[in-house]
């Protein structure tokens, strides 16, 4: 009887600890009120959550969560983490000539663009961690040369989705004074308002919508093949890619995505592109529906009809299991 009581108390204690842990502000907040009603009216929201265009299992057929967790903790290739400090070059973002077009990649999925006089930041993660538990997914040495103090005020912050390696609580709070407008998917604004961002700077859209910005800049919101969630509840907001049209450039801003027909559709509707920025580095045989394999990235670039493509989500933190040589 005493043993049973101890087991019950331990389980109860774990539940309480988990509940308290999940109440931290960094986990954000589920959509509610008018935002939730708008979500429910989305053609992409079915059965209580946003859906991909194609059937998209989280894990490849024949595997399960136990298989994935086992490989994550015990099956990573020795090449998944560099043995030495990675080389980098730090560009001074505060002194850039305003008429110069620039792309600066910070590792993983974070990058800065200055295009036709506008400054743009995409999915910044500068805290050194891509996880709610800091020590589990830390940045590689040499990839964290920038801090939030290195950034000028910028016109547009793009957030493709709310995963920890794309929407970093610590980073966006520190950058708050620098941000003029935030462009993101429907539902993600709930996190940002919960973190005291002014709703008037938020532009939240569903797939296949158009945003008219200043000085000849336009954004078309386009699909990806992925999922979202910062805690237990999944797919309460929509994951995005974006078509950015400027006076002289057309750029595809790709979020995390498995390969699918949406790339060809986007290419047919909006191509050709001057530049497509595509993920390539989070690939794994168990994740093939939600992250592209290297050869699929090339096909996506072809589908998009892009003149140039830049691959991102390269090594910054040890999330991938397969050898980096596959790149």
Stretches with model-predicted labels:
Residues 2-137, 184-253, 274-280:
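Metallo-beta-lactamase
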Residues 3-40, 45, 156, 181-190, ...:
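Cap/insert and terminal regions of metallo-dependent hydrolase folds
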Residues 111-114, 212-273, 288, 292-296:
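Catalytic core of the metallo-beta-lactamase
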Residues 126-143, 227-233, 284-290:
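Acidic/histidine-rich helix-loop elements
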């Amino acid at each position: 009887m005493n043993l049973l009581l101890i087991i019950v108390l331990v389980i109860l204690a774990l539940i309480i600890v988990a509940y308290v842990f999940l109440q931290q502000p960094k986990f954000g907040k589920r959509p509610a009120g008018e935002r939730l009603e708008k979500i429910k009216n989305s053609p992409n929201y079915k059965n209580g959550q946003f859906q991909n265009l194609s059937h998209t299992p989280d894990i490849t057929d024949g595997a399960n969560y136990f298989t994935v967790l086992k490989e994550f903790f015990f099956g990573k290739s020795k090449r998944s983490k560099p043995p030495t400090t990675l080389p980098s070059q730090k560009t001074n973002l505060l002194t850039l000539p305003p008429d110069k077009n620039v792309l600066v990649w910070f590792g993983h999925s974070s990058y800065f663009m200055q295009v036709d006089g506008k400054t743009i930041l995409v999915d910044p993660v500068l805290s050194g961690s891509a996880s709610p538990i800091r020590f589990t997914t830390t940045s590689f040495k040499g990839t964290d040369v920038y801090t939030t103090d290195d950034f000028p005020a910028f016109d547009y912050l793009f957030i493709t989705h709310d995963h920890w390696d794309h929407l970093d609580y610590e980073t966006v709070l520190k950058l708050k004074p620098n941000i003029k407008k935030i462009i993101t998917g429907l539902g993600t604004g709930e996190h940002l308002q919960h973190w005291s961002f002014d709703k008037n700077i938020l532009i939240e859209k569903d797939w296949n919508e158009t945003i008219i910005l200043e000085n000849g800049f336009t954004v078309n919101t386009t699909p990806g093949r992925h999922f979202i969630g910062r805690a237990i509840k999944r797919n309460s907001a929509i994951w995005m890619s974006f078509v950015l049209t400027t006076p002289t450039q057309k750029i595809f801003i790709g979020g995390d995505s498995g390969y699918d027909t949406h790339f060809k559709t986007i290419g047919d509707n909006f191509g050709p592109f001057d530049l497509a920025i595509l993920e390539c580095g989070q690939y794994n045989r168990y994740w093939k529906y939600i992250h592209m394999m290297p050869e699929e990235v090339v096909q996506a670039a072809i589908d998009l009809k892009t003149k140039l493509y830049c691959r991102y989500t390269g090594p910054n933190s040890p999330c991938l299991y397969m050898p980096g040589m596959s790149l």
